[in-house]
Design a protein with these regions (language model features):
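Transmembrane beta-strand segments that form the barrel wall of outer-membrane beta-barrel proteins
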Residues: 42-52, 80-87, 127-129, 163-179
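Gram-negative (and chloroplast) outer-membrane scaffold detector with strong preference
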Residues: 58-139
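Solvent-exposed loop/turn segments connecting transmembrane beta-strands
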Residues: 47-60, 92-98, 172-186
């Protein structure tokens, strides 16, 4: 059963994505779609994560990335620094005991963006570190307390891509380790 906070996050994320997608699809149809990931590019986005942490069926999160350096000696790619956060929540019960879990992974990755001839597609791979904020409680008729889990540092490895369907908006997806197994969402260009 999802918490009311998790339901509110899902509703707000869905509403923002629907409004943004509608506006950007109209703009893309008017202007024609072209990708533009390059030096100085900055975006922000929302994602839904699937798989990866305990009994959570989905997570909700955000992404921010800034392209900081051209790498002519490494295939002429671009180095981007990405900050990410996600929110997972779930509960379970068994033989009179109930558990409640909340995970909030916050991480930073260095992403290498491959240069392709197709400007609408932006593939990347990334490595980084994160900090997992964990809250877990157990309760029964005779005992209430924590679950013994603690927050801590974790490693991140991911591969993903953007597909630009307008100059300022892209579909986003990544797979990897460190949080959700699969994240999908939408990013919006800021600069």
């Amino acid at each position: 059963m999802r918490s009311s906070f998790s339901r509110k996050v899902a509703r707000v994320t869905t509403a923002i994505a629907c409004v943004a997608v509608t506006a950007q699809v109209a703009a893309a149809q008017a202007k024609g779609a072209a990708g533009n990931f390059g030096l100085g590019y900055t975006d922000v986005g929302v994602v839904v994560g699937l798989g990866g942490l305990g009994g959570a069926s989905a997570s909700f999160g955000g992404r921010f990335e800034h392209a900081i350096k051209a790498l002519p000696d490494l295939g002429n790619g671009i180095l981007g620094i990405q900050a990410a956060f996600d929110y997972y929540s779930w509960s379970a019960s068994f033989t009179g005991y109930g558990w409640s879990y909340k995970y909030i992974p916050v991480g930073v990755t260095a992403n290498y963006h491959f240069k392709l001839d197709e400007p609408k597609i932006d593939p990347f791979v990334g490595l980084g570190l994160g900090y997992n904020i964990i809250s877990c409680s157990v309760n029964s008729g005779t005992f209430n307390g924590d679950c013994g889990y603690s927050s801590g540092i974790y490693a991140i490895a991911r591969a993903g891509a953007r597909y630009f369907f307008s100059p300022s908006m892209a579909l986003y997806g990544d797979v990897g380790a460190g949080g959700a197994t699969l994240n999908v969402g939408v990013t919006f260009k800021l600069h």
